[in-house]
Design a protein with these regions (language model features):
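N-terminal cap/leader regions of alpha/beta-hydrolase-fold enzymes
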Residues: 1-231
Length: 231
């Protein structure tokens, strides 16, 4: 069942999309969006996770700036709109929002209390920051933009983390990827996978650079990881 819920955070209320599995109780996964908001792709990822047996929740990270953002990945004006939102986005406040969402979701009827965080691009960075600052049960990062700027916080990572990097990512340079990999080698609970020949958002269904084989590999690894960590 798919629906909307309201998250009461420390800084205010905001909405979230929720997809529930057929069988409850179940663990939960927060799905953190890219610069396009809680759009068709993000809702689709939630629906797929629900089919795999998870309660999937996608909070509206842009609620302070523009509640209800739902942009198209194929529209140039929407791209520019999303990039402007991203530039003005308060990442510190955003990490608090994610943690508040996790706290609320852990107590939802039908949730066993375990909550992982999974994010794409901006959402990937917010997954990293939330895990480092507040702790989560598990974390999955898909091509988290600007992660290299926050590697000084890596010591705060204690939860199991899975990270997916596209080797030809036009938004995360090879040098930045090398920095990320080096920093995470000190964390035995972190696993980084690189995908040769892949560009940014290769796992996004409607993305320009979508690659079905690479997406299936990454998503299969994610599914296995989540089932292992949230049992």
């Amino acid at each position: 069942m798919n629906d909307r819920i309201t998250i009461e955070g420390r800084d205010g209320e905001f909405s979230a999309y929720i997809a529930r599995p057929k069988v409850l109780p179940a663990p939960a996964v927060l799905v953190l969006h890219e610069v396009f908001g809680v759009n068709t792709d993000i809702r689709g990822h939630c629906d797929e996770l629900a089919e795999q047996g998870f309660i999937a929740v996608a909070p509206d990270l842009f609620w302070r700036q523009e509640p209800g953002v739902d942009l198209s990945v194929t529209s140039e004006p929407d791209w520019q709109h999303g990039l402007r939102l991203n530039q003005a986005y308060d990442r510190d406040a955003g990490a608090r929002d994610v943690k508040d969402t996790a706290n609320v979701v852990a107590k939802l009827p039908g949730c066993i209390g375990k909550v992982a965080v999974l994010g794409y691009c901006l959402g990937g960075l917010m997954t990293f920051l939330t895990a480092a600052r507040y702790g989560v049960d598990a974390a999955v990062v898909y091509h988290g933009g600007d992660t290299e700027k926050y590697l000084g916080e890596v010591d705060g990572l204690h939860a199991p983390m899975l990270m997916h990097l596209a080797e030809e990512d036009e938004f995360i340079s090879k040098a930045a990827q090398a920095e990320i990999k080096k920093a995470l080698t000190s964390k035995p609970n972190a696993t980084v996978y690189s995908y040769p020949g892949q560009r940014h958002a290769f796992s996004r269904h409607n993305g320009t650079h979508y690659n079905a084989a690479a997406a299936a590999l990454a998503n299969g690894r994610t599914s296995e990881f989540l089932h292992q960590q949230l049992r």
